[in-house]
Amino acid sequence: MAEFDSKVPVSGMNNHVFEACHHVVKALRASDNNLDANLRKLLSDLEMHLSTFGIADTKVEDAGFSEIKKRFKEAVKRIRSWETNQSTMFEAGLSEADQFFQALYDVQTVLVGFKALPMKTNQMEKDVYNQATVALDIAMLRLEKELCDVLHQHKRHVQPDYLAVSSRRKDIVYDESFVSLDDEVIVEASSHEDDEQISDFYNSDLVDPIVLPHIKAIANAMFACEYDQPFCEAFIGVQREALEEYMVTLEMERFSCVDVLRMDWEDLNGAMRKWTKVVKIITQVYLASEKQLCDQILGDFESISTACFIEISKDAILSLLNFGEAVVLRSCKPEMLERFLSMYEVSAEILVDVDNLFPDETGSSLRIAFHNLSKKLADHTTTTFLKFKDAIASDESTRPFHGGGIHHLTRYVMNYLKLLPEYTDSLNSLLQNIHVDDSIPEKTGEDVLPSTFSPMARHLRSIVTTLESSLERKAQLYADEALKSIFLMNNFRYMVQKVKGSELRRLFGDEWIRKHIASYQCNVTNYERSTWSSILALLRDNNDSVRTLRERCRLFSLAFDDVYKNQTRWSVPDSELRDDLHISTSVKVVQSYRGFLGRNAVRIGEKHIRYTCEDIENMLLDLFECLPSPRSLRSSRKR
C-alpha cells in the first residue's frame, strides 16, 4: 500500500509546470531560513528531479518536456477515473490503490510548491495551480467515499452468542404490594444467576483487520492534504451510526426522563434489567473495541483519535446516563430494591472501564457523569433498602389471614431476602456506616462465621425481626388461640426453612436458626395444649358412673367433631411439619381414646360410642389440609 512520504515522483507536468516548478525552487531558496524540515526535503527532491531532466537551469530538452507532460496527464486521468467509479479501490486491488495514491501525491507535491510562492502572477502558473486543485478536490471526495464504503462493507458485529441481552428465562415482576414473589417464581428471580459473563475489556474487531492498512492510508493522505476535518466527519458518522445500530440490536430503547417517570413497574423493571446488561456490553466491550479502532487508524494523531472516539460514543453514552439519572428520580419503593442494587453494582463495576476509556480532559465530562450517577444510585439504593424495612413495619391487616397459613408478607420478605446475598459486597459497602439494632449479640466461636456480623447480616436480621413483630400483631386478629399458634408456627417455620436452605444461612448464623426453631416448636406445643388439653381431660378415669362415662364419651365426640370441622379448613403448607403434627396429635389423642375405650367400652355400651380408634386416627389425617368445606364426618357407629 502506497504511503505519503518524502519521495517526489515525476508526474504529468507539461512545459508550463516545469517553468512553474523552477519559480518554486527560486522562491524556496530565497526563504530557506523559514522552511521546516519537510519542506527543505521537498526542495532537495525537486531540485534533484529537475536536474535529472536537465532543467537545473533554464534550458530543457524537448524530449523531457514531452515525457513529463504525458505523465502529468496520466496522473490527472487516473484521479478522474475514480470520480464516478462505484466500486472501491480495496476491491480493485493493491496495485490500483497504490497508483491512485501515487497520482494524488504527485498533485499534492505541485500544490505544496505553488503555495510557497508569494503569488501566481502569470496565466501559466494559474492554469497549473487550478488543474492541481481540481484534481485534489476530486481525489479527496473519492477518498471520503472510499472510507465510508469500506467501513460499511467490512463492518463486524460483536458476536451475540456471549453478549445476548435477552435472558433465557423470564423476568420476575414484583407486585407493588406484598402479595407476589411466591416460591414457584423465586427460582427465576435473581438477575445475577444467569447473567452472561463479559470479560473485562474484551476487544472485538469492529472492522475486518484486513482493511485497516487501507483505511490508515486514506487517513494519512487526507491529513497530508489538510482534509483532516472531512475525514473525521465521515469516520465519526459511519462509526456513530454503527453504534446506534448495535444499540438497536441490544434492544436498548432511548427513553426521555418523562418516559421513565411514567412507566408502569413491569415495563420499568424490564428496562432497568436491560440497562444493567447493555451498559456493561457497551463500556467493557464495544467502546473498548471502538477506542482500539480509533487508535489503530489515527494513532499518529493522538488528540484527533481521542476527539473522534468521544464524538462516536457520546450519544450512546448520554442515552445510558440519562436513563440512569431518570431512574433515580423515581420513588424508593421496596419492590425496586433488587433492580437498584443491580444498577448500582454495575455502575460501580464499570467505573474503572470508563476511566480507561476517557482518561483525558476532553472526556472528563463523560467520566465525571458516570461517577456522579454511581453515587446517586448508591444513595438511592440505600434509601430504598431502609424503606423496605419501614414498609414491612407499616403493613397492617384488619382481618386474620385465612386458615392460619403462610402470610403473603412472609413469603415476599423471605424470598426477597434470598436474592440479596448475591449483592453482599455492595450491601456491606452501602450499609457499613448505618447502625441497626441486632437480635444476635456478637461473639466468637468455631461455629460462628465472620459474615454473621457483617453490616448486611445485621440489617437482614433486623428486617426479619420487624417481620416477626408484624406477624405477632397479625396473630392477635385470631379469636382462636389454637389458630393463632398455627399461624405463628407456619410463618416462623417458613422463615427458618428459607434461611437454612439458602445463602442466608451464613449471614443469619446457626444461633439464629436454633432460636427460631425453638420459637415455632413452642407454637406447636401451644397449639396442642389449647386444642386438645380440655378434650383429652374428658378421657380420664375418675371411677365415674356409667351415666357419667357415657356423657364423657358423647362430649368427646362433639368436641372432636368441632375440631374436625374447623381444623380441616386450617392450613399447614409444609408437608413435613404437617406430618409431624399428625403423628404428634395421633399419639396423644388416639392413645388416650384407645385407653379410655379399653377400660370403659363394655360399661358405656357400643351404641353410645360414635367413633372407633381407627375413625379418630383417619380423621386426624384430614386436619390442616385447608379444605374449602369439611368432608362429611366419618361414619358414626351408633349402635
UniProtKB/Swiss-Prot annotation:
GO biological process: defense response by callose deposition; exocytosis; immune response; positive regulation of extracellular exosome assembly; protein transport; regulation of protein targeting
MF-aspect GO terms: phosphatidylinositol-4,5-bisphosphate binding
Compartment annotation: Secreted, Extracellular exosome; Secreted; Cell membrane; Cytoplasm
Family annotation (InterPro entries): Cullin_repeat-like_dom_sf (IPR016159), Exo70 (IPR004140), Exo70_C (IPR046364)
Entry annotated with the keyword Coiled coil: no
Domain of life: Eukaryota
Keywords of the record: Cell membrane, Cytoplasm, Exocytosis, Membrane, Protein transport, Secreted, Transport
Phenotype when the gene is knocked out: Unability to recruit a number of exocyst subunits to the exocyst-positive organelle (EXPO).
UniProt entry tagged with the keyword Isomerase: no
GO cellular component, one term: endomembrane system
Major site of localization recorded for this protein: secreted
Stretches that traverse the bilayer: none
Tissue expression from the record: Expressed in roots, in the root-hair zone, both in root hair and nonhair cells.
Family matches, as Pfam families: Exo70_C, Exo70_N
Family: Belongs to the EXO70 family.
Family annotation (PANTHER family): EXOCYST COMPLEX COMPONENT EXO70E2, EXOCYST COMPLEX PROTEIN EXO70
Function field: Influences the subcellular localization patterns of other exocyst complex proteins (e.g. SEC5A, SEC15A, SEC15B and EXO84B) leading to their recruitment to exocyst, well-defined large punctate structures throughout the cytosol. Essential component for the formation and the recruitment of exocyst subunits to the exocyst-positive organelle (EXPO), a secreted double membrane structure also called extracellular exosome, that acts as a sequester for cytosolic proteins to release them into the apoplast.
The protein's assembly and partners: Component of the exocyst complex and of the exocyst-positive organelle (EXPO). Interacts with SEC6, SEC10A and SEC10B.
UniProt name for this protein: Exocyst complex component EXO70E2
